[in-house]
Amino acid sequence: MGCCGCSRGCGSGCGGCGSSCGGCGSGCGGCGSGRGGCGSGCGGCSSSCGGCGSRCYVPVCCCKPVCSWVPACSCTSCGSCGGSKGGCGSCGGSKGGCGSCGGSKGGCGSCGCSQSSCCKPCCCSSGCGSSCCQSSCCKPCCCQSSCCVPVCCQSSCCKPCCCQSNCCVPVCCQCKI
C-alpha cells in the first residue's frame, strides 16, 4: 500500500514501504505524496510543532495539503500568524484561516486591507509604515512621524495615536474628541 507521505523511513517514491514507513496504518491507503484523502491512520495534524522558532511547522503527514507547511499558529511566537490556533485539522484555508487570525475578509475590505489572506491584515492609514498596522483590522492606526518602533503604535486605534517624546517605550495616548 502507499505510504501516504510519512516523514520517516520512506524513499522518494514512498511506494511499497511497508513496515518501514512506520505509523501510516491502513487508513492511509493510496494517498501518495499529496496526502489528499488520508485517513486518521496518517497520524493527523496535532499541534506538536516543537519549538516556536521561525521554522516551526505542523507535521508533514498532514492529511490537508493546504496546512502542511504553513506556520503553526498553535505557537504564539511562530511565524506570522501569532494566534493560538490548533493544528492542521482546524486550519481552514491558507495561512491558518481568517477567523482566528484577525478578522474576516469582509472586515478587512471595509477598512482598506489589501492582503489576500486575512491571517495578518494590514490596515494602516496613508503614510503609516508596516509597524503601524493593527492586528484586529477595525480602524486605521497612525503614529507620529517620529515613531520608529512598533511599540509606539496603539493596538485599539479609534483615533490617531500620539506617542510621547520618548518613542522607545510603549507609551501612547489616544486622541479623543
Curated annotation (Swiss-Prot):
Sequence repeats: 62-65, 118-121, 137-140, 147-150, 157-160, 167-170
Annotated signal peptide: none
Tissue expression from the record: Restricted to hair root, not detected in any other tissues.
Region (6 X 4 AA repeats of C-C-X-P): 62-170
Gene Ontology annotations for the cellular component aspect, listed alphabetically: cytosol; intermediate filament
Residue ranges of coiled coil: none
Keywords associated with the record: Keratin, Repeat
Family: Belongs to the KRTAP type 5 family.
Subunit relationships: Interacts with hair keratins.
Function: In the hair cortex, hair keratin intermediate filaments are embedded in an interfilamentous matrix, consisting of hair keratin-associated protein (KRTAP), which are essential for the formation of a rigid and resistant hair shaft through their extensive disulfide bond cross-linking with abundant cysteine residues of hair keratins. The matrix proteins include the high-sulfur and high-glycine-tyrosine keratins.
Protein's UniProt name: Keratin-associated protein 5-2
Native source species: Homo sapiens
